[in-house]
Amino acid sequence: MIRYPNGKSYQPKTAASSLQKKPSYSNRGMTLEDDLNETNMYYQSHSIAVIHKKPTPVQIVQVDYPKRSAAVIKEAYFKQSSTTDYNGVYKGRYIDFEAKETKSRTSFPLQNFHDHQIEHMKQVVAQDGICFVIISAFEEIYFLEAEKLFYFWERKKQNGRKSIRKDELQEAAHPISLGYSPRIDYIKIIDQLYFSPS
């Protein structure tokens, strides 16, 4: 019989127990996020724009101090992000955006946003910043200007739809084709909307 160093015997996992494992939804948005991070690295390395992902704030609960110079965090939790996912600068203009993903085939749920995020976006727009959402939905990627998101958000708050229908999103947003380098070239749309001659 095989035993661990602590004396307990080895118990192999059975096929039945591995089949009962519940699916994990913890990294649903990682593909979109990874593609955006690669895109932003491309923009920065080619001196196009400087856009960074904001770190998720962490609430530290318990710290051990075995030595004065060696503090060890024993317990910490991710806090709710207070603003948007990404910010930076492009052609002298402040850029601020959120990245969202849904598996729904019919609509984009507005519950993906929080009041404080919408309020932050409104403040950015009021200061003439470029603010938008990159949405991965219906096997497509969309660029939705913050001002258009505000319409859907206000409709929801007036006891209206709690989501953006597929046809509404396709009409209000700008599609972004996936590329190789950069992967999600959202700067093209920013150029069309904010920097092309009228």
Curated annotation (Swiss-Prot):
Q: Which GO terms describe its biological process?
A: chromosome segregation; DNA recombination; DNA repair
**Pfam families according to UniProt:** RecU
Name the chemical reaction catalysed here. Answer: Endonucleolytic cleavage at a junction such as a reciprocal single-stranded crossover between two homologous DNA duplexes (Holliday junction)
User: Where is the region Disordered?
Assistant: 1-29
**The enzyme's E.C. designation:** 3.1.21.10
Q: In which family does this protein belong, per the annotation?
A: Belongs to the RecU family.
Q: Which HAMAP family match?
A: RecU
| Function field | Endonuclease that resolves Holliday junction intermediates in genetic recombination. Cleaves mobile four-strand junctions by introducing symmetrical nicks in paired strands. Promotes annealing of linear ssDNA with homologous dsDNA. Required for DNA repair, homologous recombination and chromosome segregation.
Query: What name does UniProt use for this protein?
Result: Holliday junction resolvase RecU
Q: Which organism is it from?
A: Bacillus licheniformis (strain ATCC 14580 / DSM 13 / JCM 2505 / CCUG 7422 / NBRC 12200 / NCIMB 9375 / NCTC 10341 / NRRL NRS-1264 / Gibson 46)
Which gene specifies this protein's sequence?
recU
